[in-house]
Amino acid sequence: MKLRPGIVIAPWIDPRVEVRDSPLHGRGMFARESFGSDEVVLIWGGTVFTEGDLKAGRAKPGSVTLIEEGLYLGDPAGAPEADDYCLNHSCDSNLWMRDAITLVTRDVVEEDEELTIDYALWETDPAWGIETCRCGSPHCRGTVGGTDWRLPELQERYAGHFAPVIEGWIEAVGY
């Protein structure tokens, strides 16, 4: 599919996933049944926006991610929170990215396990951050920021599974 401003992408969440209260933060996504390695769990949906659309306030703040240079996926301003945004962060997540909108399992995920993703896989806004991470992972960074994708240990851990824009930056600049 050729991405262009205004296109609406329908979200998809595997029916083996449920959203419920999370010990990490607010609401989270949990496996109703186990998943094997490299299984598609979620395809983000939303509207494709330009930077101009964002500046004009057409996109809901907090729902936007860079999917190509100059193009963003997010919900329209005023839209209710969708279930595909109930995915909590972990510094050693059990999901990662297959492409700009598809999230897959890194390994086997057991029934009742919370599905998590490291926000460094797509977050590029230097002003964005989580002051206190509560993931509890041995790899916990303590704080999470919009430039964490530049950390060598994350580039090694998640090689090939960042958002394509970030993968391109890593290859071009050699962070």
Question: Residues of each region from the PLM?
Answer:
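Catalytic cores of histone-lysine modification enzymes
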Residues: K2-R98
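C-terminal SET catalytic tail plus cysteine-rich post-SET Zn-binding segment of SAM-dependent SET-domain
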Residues: H89-Y175
